Amino acid sequence: MLLYRLGQQPHIASTAGLGGLYSDGRWHEVGTPILYTSEHLSLAKLEVLANAATLPRNYFLLTLEIADHASTQYLEVADLPPGWNGLPYRRETAQLAQSWIQAGTHWLLRVPSIHSPNEYNCLLNPLHPDHAQLRIVSTEPHPFDARLKQ
């Protein structure tokens, strides 16, 4: 199974989830190593564009491969607390993912995108033993079409 991630150098090359150590997110608290990926490149793009005030520049695409049978915990919209998709981030939502990481049972947590709830992002726990099986397929420049932010 392929997963996609967009970001800038030098951070895009790391799969250690170090960004979670420095800032919080919808699915984690500060100090938590976590790697955000998307099941589709188009969703990865949507996630970046939704959080960018201007057209992202100097972005790279990281394509990852994991086994189709990778241990995964699934969350659907019905499993999430009211307001899970609002701002500021809900503490309850981050706590769901914190519990997943602390349990250490599953390598991936598959969560709905707030921008397209019928599509999914996959969060990877870099502390899980299966993370050693993660394979980098490619890292390549990925420019955004100027028409996406006018």
For each predicted feature, which ranges?
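A short, exposed loop/beta-hairpin motif centered on an aromatic-Gly-Thr core
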Residues: 31-37
